[in-house]
Amino acid sequence: SQEEENEQMGMYDEDENRLFKNTDTNGRFHSDWCSMIYSRLMLARNLLTEDGVIFISIDDNEEDNLKKICDEVFGAVNYVATFPWRKRTAKSDVPFGVSQDYEYILCFAKASNFAASVEGKERKYYETPDFAGRPWRVHDLTKQTTASERPNSYFTIVNPKTGAQYPANPNRTWAITEDTFRTYYVENRIVFPGDYDFLNIQKPVLRYWKADDMKKAGDKFGKVAVSTKLPDNIGMSQDGTKEITNLLGAKAFSFPKPAALIKYLISISSEEGDFVLDFFSGSATTAHAVMQLNAEDGGHRKFIMVQLPEKCDEASEAYKAGYKNICEIGKERIRRAGMKIKDNLEQNGTDIQYLHKELK
């Protein structure tokens, strides 16, 4: 609770007088921050499923400390990646003449069986009369190795039907040995030039069956690995501000993440029925992102938002707009974003129900 955190940090005396804020002028600033985040990460790890994953956004000030803490809590072997996110365009009036425009999204898994993925470009499979009901694709049969590196793969392939010869390139040998070629030929896994009119190939290629691809890939079939370079269309902090201003009619929250950023992270790491927990909910961007992603892919993800009822400054736009604490901002955003998404779906002929529950 907020009270427990204040007690741990020694922020009040016995008469409940505030002693200090945890600002960067506090000599124990980093230690206090580390103590606060450590306890929350321990709880987060306990709540993760075995194939679960956590994303944590941080700026330069604590990125190094956060990585060390996460290595201890989740294990260094479960570090997935760091995604640099550009939060703003460069500013000129900055210390040392360097504009710090990025935050860093650290990703850790509960266990090593997690794998991020995105929908990949669909592979081209062919259906031919000679293999009815067995779609197949082709793959290069060469490898980036020289004849001296792989002498067993430096040989001439001969088409048993036509006698046509295909010598290996000394700078790029075959990916298989001569014995393996014979085995693959018997298994119908070698495709030669001229076998199919629709294939424009100049040398033998390898045939892969779609059924084998599906068996090997399992749930990840049709998907590819993701890059730490985030997509260009996920937005910056100013886009997050526009979103919440358009929804609530006021700049009710400072520096909110754009929903597109959170939606992308959820899309690469979750299944359609997963739970998504955000225990620094703020303006409830995560809830907005979950609802939007569900609307787009037909998923049934549920979200849990956790936020202390921190009071809004009376001089802030949020307070003037009627929001007394941050929780009220988040609840109203969830309501309005949910109704907007619902209206958009119904305009497209989709009938959905909107349900809101609050636990106290």
Language-model regions, residue ranges each:
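Class I S-adenosyl-L-methionine
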Residues: 1-275, 297, 308-314
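Beta-strand segments within the central parallel beta-sheet cores of soluble alpha/beta enzyme folds
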Residues: 81-84, 281, 302-305
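A glycine-rich phosphate-binding loop feature that marks nucleotide/adenosyl-phosphate handling sites
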Residues: 123, 198-206, 281-284, 350-359
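A phosphate-binding catalytic loop at a beta-strand-loop-alpha-helix junction
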Residues: 274-293
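PRPP-dependent phosphoribosyltransferase catalytic core
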Residues: 292-360
